[in-house]
UniProtKB/Swiss-Prot annotation:
It catalyses: [protein]-peptidylproline (omega=180) = [protein]-peptidylproline (omega=0). Residues 1-12 have a biased composition (Polar residues). Residues 38-52 have a biased composition (Pro residues). It comes from Aspergillus fumigatus (strain ATCC MYA-4609 / CBS 101355 / FGSC A1100 / Af293). This is Serine/threonine-protein phosphatase 2A activator 2.
Length: 422
């Protein structure tokens, strides 16, 4: 029997919907279906193996080897996976309980200075390749391809003349990770996979004994922060689209590591609690010392809507955690599950001689066509055509950085940002 209109669940005329309640229900639903379970133990940092003996080493050009779900599962059980986790977590552990300013008077080692010089050289190239006027478009600016090509053209020279590598094959292998840390030339996007490429560039240099464990705090506080600032400049200049964005339900449209490194810094802090991210005064006073606070400050500054509750509900939810140790553990779980554990991200991971693939993993016969065939982890690989719709076949997602920048252009200055439903 069809229900009568009297028994339908539609609200009576004039009844005001409680949208905040709906949002809370949606949050609870999303939390129950995504993210690591709080009952999962915090991942431990695997021992970092000593760098290999490279005296008779043969270098190879990095290629993609994760072509299927089986390849991904093989990677997750491999020594390279353990090395990546160990290196990343060791960096995070090296800054636990330390402020960025703790190292401000410490001189950088010669190799750290060389790495910083390369990042600064790329920053200067951004100024030489201004964005193309797209009439207010918030999608990726094609001028990024000019920057990418310029970096690719000079990359080998930098590794020879600045970094100090002399072996041509070693330069080809190591430099591949740096150029692919800027974003996708084809898709005009940037995400945690590109950020991971930057860390793999550093890991390769560590495997070549150009970075020591003693350098790890400086890697986070100087090298990584300079890279992140470079990428903010790139995002503001070229409006790169967020690769594989989760929208408001993601931690951040572009970066993950600021939250891992930043949470480690704040473990056992005497007065900055997780809820402090809602206090503008704390962000302004402490943001230059703590990466987590700086990233929250940045995210809030580029959004068109005011308030973490509306534009970053995941960060808002995390702020309710008991302490920073809980958040640090959660970030380690997320790195394993949401970065290394995601096939759409890891199918772009590059394997060479320093970060070797398991011999059983797939191989492409034509590396030039790597972007044309991809898999979502459902066993159905398919082609991506020239008129693709962003990363992994979702609809194209405009740059959130661009949205804020274009709004400020229209209204002038920073302006007041609207609160949803207000």
């Amino acid at each position: 029997m069809m229900p009568s209109h009297a028994t339908m669940s539609s609200p009576p005329a004039g009844t005001k919907l409680d949208l905040s309640k709906k949002l809370s229900e949606l949050r609870a639903s999303r939390r129950s279906h995504s993210g690591p379970s709080p009952r999962e133990p915090t991942p431990v940092t695997p021992p970092l193996p000593s760098p290999p003996d490279l005296s008779t080493h043969t270098y190879t050009r990095p290629v993609r080897r994760i072509l299927s779900r089986k390849d991904h599962e093989t990677f997750l059980a491999s020594s390279t996976y353990t090395l990546v986790v160990s290196f990343t977590f060791s960096l995070s552990d090296s800054v636990r309980g330390r402020a960025v300013t703790d190292n401000k008077d410490q001189p950088a080692s010669p190799n750290i200075s060389r790495i910083l010089s390369v990042i600064d050289t790329i920053r200067q190239l951004v100024d030489k390749h201004p964005s193309i006027d797209q009439g207010g478009s918030r999608f990726g600016n094609p001028a990024f391809r000019d920057l990418f090509d310029d970096v690719a053209a000079q990359n080998a020279t930098w590794h020879r003349e600045i970094i100090g590598l002399q072996n041509a094959d070693a330069i080809e292998e190591v430099s591949s990770y740096l150029v692919h840390s800027l974003g996708s030339r084809d898709r005009l996007d940037y995400g945690s996979g590109h950020e991971l490429n930057f860390m793999m560039w550093l890991l390769c240099l560590r495997q070549m004994q150009m970075i020591s464990t003693a350098d790890f705090p400086m890697i986070v506080f100087r090298v990584y922060l300079e890279y992140m600032r470079l990428m903010r400049q790139v995002q503001m200049t070229y409006y790169l689209e967020p690769a594989g964005s989760h929208g408001v339900w993601g931690l951040d449209d572009y970066h993950f590591l600021p939250f891992l490194f930043g949470a480690a810094q704040l473990v056992d802090h005497p007065y900055i609690t997780p809820l402090a991210i809602h206090n503008t005064a704390v962000l302004d006073e402490e943001g230059d010392k703590y990466i987590y606070l700086d990233q929250v400050r940045w995210v809030d500054s580029v959004k068109t809507v005011k308030g973490l509750r509306w534009h970053s509900p995941m960060l808002d939810d995390i702020s309710g955690a008991k302490n920073w140790l809980k958040i640090e553990g959660g970030m380690k779980k997320m790195f394993i599950k949401e970065v290394l554990g995601k096939l759409p991200i890891m199918q772009h991971f590059l394997f060479g001689s320093l970060l070797p693939a398991d011999p059983s993993m797939g191989e492409r016969s034509d590396d030039a066509q790597e972007d044309d065939l991809h898999d979502h982890g459902n066993g159905n690989p398919h082609a991506r055509h020239t008129d693709h719709f962003g990363d992994c076949c979702g609809i194209k997602v405009p740059s959130t950085v661009a949205a804020g920048a274009e709004m400020r252009k229209r209204i002038g200055g920073t302006g007041l940002r609207p609160i949803p439903f207000d």
